[in-house]
UniProtKB/Swiss-Prot annotation:
MF-aspect GO terms: acetylesterase activity; cutinase activity
Location of this chain's protein in the cell: Secreted; Periplasm
Described function: Catalyzes the hydrolysis of cutin, a polyester that forms the structure of plant cuticle. Shows esterase activity towards p-nitrophenol-linked aliphatic esters (pNP-aliphatic esters). Capable of degrading the plastic poly(ethylene terephthalate) (PET), the most abundant polyester plastic in the world.
UniProt-listed Pfam families: PETase
Example of a GO cellular component annotation carried by this entry: extracellular region
Name of the molecule in the record: Cutinase cut1
Temperature curve summary: Optimum temperature is 55 degrees Celsius. Optimum temperature is 65 degrees Celsius.
UniProt record similarity statement: Belongs to the AB hydrolase superfamily.
Leader sequence segment: 1-58
Organism per entry: Thermobifida fusca (Thermomonospora fusca)
Activity control note: Activated by magnesium ions. Activated by calcium ions.
Catalytic center residues: S188, D234, H266
Length: 319
């Protein structure tokens, strides 16, 4: 540039006034396109952030209760207040009557029927009824037609008890039951009955035999998620001839677990037991409510071996 030449300035009209710079149409189009792409990317990032912040289990319509903890599951009662209703022996069809425990909160819940063992009454499993109901289930603990009823008879009576809750109980009970989500449990011969009914009703969501007894050792026809709880000092239904072979015979294609209590006898399920309560609730929550928040307690499961309350635990994890 010559030493005294004027520097280029804004475009001027004939009168020396500055003129507006006109952006070419192609450049305006490019700027608009970049702005739109930036806005879309920002919106996508916002939606992704919101999605990641939302709980993964929020879509489960069966989820009930707060996030579970060891302390919550090991406590004597869960987060729900419970009411109870008597099922009269004279009004019950196909079983000996019982007691129904249900959450007071007006909602729908899975339903569970529990049978006592040989010579036992519902009183021997009453603690389980109230404990499980307090975690968000409708539960019936039954008396059998006679205390000497055998396992297959107890299977039929468990089935009748489920039907009673769905069809014949009070409206307070019936209105709270989701009849598509049913489970069974039982102690001793009631545990054998639980296995028998599970082999006959693949629509059940869960089965939990407790120190089970049955002459049949092959349960390969069961298609229901099953947790078997045995006791290492059981001399009535020794785990070597009952709980363990029962578990081993269940197909590996189903969700199943075996928990053996350490230092416990055949009658461990008849009094409040922290381990039985905790893992029974976790199993029912996982498979009746499809609540994966409880998987953490089942997979990998409790620590077993020396100095623990569990002698052995094995399963078909992951669930």
């Amino acid at each position: 540039m010559p030493p005294h030449a004027a520097r280029p300035g804004p475009a001027q009209n004939r009168r020396g006034r500055a003129m507006a710079v006109i952006t070419p149409r192609r450049e305006r189009s490019s700027l608009l396109s970049r702005a739109l792409r930036f806005t879309a990317a920002a919106a996508t990032a916002l939606v992704t952030a919101v999605s990641l912040a939302a709980p993964a289990h929020a879509a489960n319509p069966y989820e009930r209760g707060p996030n579970p903890t060891d302390a919550l599951l090991e406590a004597r009662s869960g987060p729900f207040s419970v009411s109870e209703e008597r099922a009269s022996r004279f009004g019950a069809d196909g079983f000996g009557g019982g007691t129904i425990y249900y959450p007071r909160e007006n909602n729908t819940y899975g339903a569970v029927a529990i049978s006592p063992g040989y010579t036992g009454t519902q009183a021997s499993v009453a603690w389980l009824g109230e404990r499980i109901a307090s975690h968000g289930f409708v539960v019936i603990t039954i008396d059998t037609n006679t205390t000497l009823d055998q396992p297959d008879s107890r299977a039929r009576q468990l089935n009748a008890a489920l039907d009673y809750m769905i069809n014949d109980a009070s409206s307070a009970v019936r209105s709270r039951i989701d009849s598509s989500r049913l489970a069974v449990m039982g102690h001793s011969m009631g545990g054998g009955g639980t296995l028998r009914l599970a082999s006959q009703r693949p629509d059940l969501k869960a089965a939990i035999p407790l120190t089970p007894w049955h002459l049949n050792k092959n349960w390969s026809s069961v298609r229901v998620p099953t947790l078997i709880i045995g006791a290492d000092l059981d001399t009535i239904a020794p785990v070597l001839t009952h709980a363990r072979p029962f578990y081993n015979s269940l197909p590996t294609s189903i969700s199943k677990a075996y928990l053996e209590l350490d230092g416990a006898t055949h009658f461990a399920p008849n009094i409040p037991n922290k381990i039985i309560g905790k893992y029974s609730v976790a199993w029912l929550k996982r498979f009746v409510d499809n609540d994966t928040r409880y998987t953490q307690f089942l997979c990998p499961g409790p620590r077993d071996g020396l100095f623990g309350e569990v002698e052995e635990y094995r399963s078909t994890c992951p669930f």
